[in-house]
Amino acid sequence: MSCHNCSDPQVLCSSGQLFLQPLWDHLRSWEALLQSPFFPVIFSITTYVGFCLPFVVLDILCSWVPALRRYKIHPDFSPSAQQLLPCLGQTLYQHVMFVFPVTLLHWARSPALLPHEAPELLLLLHHILFCLLLFDMEFFVWHLLHHKVPWLYRTFHKVHHQNSSSFALATQYMSVWELFSLGFFDMMNVTLLGCHPLTTLTFHVVNIWLSVEDHSGYNFPWSTHRLVPFGWYGGVVHHDLHHSHFNCNFAPYFTHWDKILGTLRTASVPAR
């Protein structure tokens, strides 16, 4: 159909789809890898470790470049090798021993099918936002329950709070139950919304980045909570208060659920 015969919304949608089509065509050239049962684990580990590494490097550089400490929420804290290595080891162990068998079973039952067409850009952005909002609500409820019910906290969530001052590689330092719960929320949301595979990949990248940033311990001028207006997004300062006080800020990203239930706690952090 000629563009002269298209309505404005159709033209806009087509433009959005054309914008992402080259990227999707490139990814589809790796179709064998994307459809492999190994891909979810490889993708998850490499994305997570890749996002953590810059913060690990910054923590090391803080010893030689004291000016970097002005961006740290806890300027006198830097994780030691004895703290970093168990976190990394547990992430690798859990993905190999627990996540991979589940993805293998899912692959055997329903292999991934890759459509030829890319998603429309606006639809991709809408789906990512909705997935984040759904995940934020689901984890808020899960998190609140695992703090309010002592048995749930001791059995499943306490391990995540072993490090009172958080750092990037501590993001996934958690029990297998917590890891699977978060993974289940991720996959349920993209399935409920019928997300395109490219949208699903993008959402996972965004979700991993936001969770690592929340635990990084660094409050930069470009941190997400500084970019989102009106205090809608909590960010690293918001989550650090949770690790410090335990009884507040249960939502991972946004602040509305904590505001509604009266569990929001804020801190005045000077601009850097």
From Swiss-Prot:
InterPro entries: Fatty_acid_hydroxylase, Sterol_Desaturase_Related. A motif (Histidine box-2) lies at residues 157-161. Residues 129-263 form the Fatty acid hydroxylase domain. It catalyses: cholesterol + AH2 + O2 = 25-hydroxycholesterol + A + H2O; cholesterol + NADPH + O2 + H(+) = 25-hydroxycholesterol + NADP(+) + H2O. A motif (Histidine box-1) lies at residues 142-146. Keywords: Endoplasmic reticulum, Glycoprotein, Iron, Lipid biosynthesis, Lipid metabolism, Membrane, Metal-binding, Monooxygenase, Oxidoreductase, Steroid biosynthesis, Steroid metabolism, Sterol biosynthesis, Sterol metabolism, Transmembrane, Transmembrane helix. It is found in: Endoplasmic reticulum membrane. It is a multi-pass membrane protein. The keyword Mitochondrion does not apply. Glycans are attached at N5, N163, N189. A motif (Histidine box-3) lies at residues 238-244. Belongs to the sterol desaturase family. Catalyzes the formation of 25-hydroxycholesterol from cholesterol, leading to repress cholesterol biosynthetic enzymes. Plays a key role in cell positioning and movement in lymphoid tissues: 25-hydroxycholesterol is an intermediate in biosynthesis of 7-alpha,25-dihydroxycholesterol (7-alpha,25-OHC), an oxysterol that acts as a ligand for the G protein-coupled receptor GPR183/EBI2, a chemotactic receptor for a number of lymphoid cells. This is Cholesterol 25-hydroxylase. The gene is CH25H.
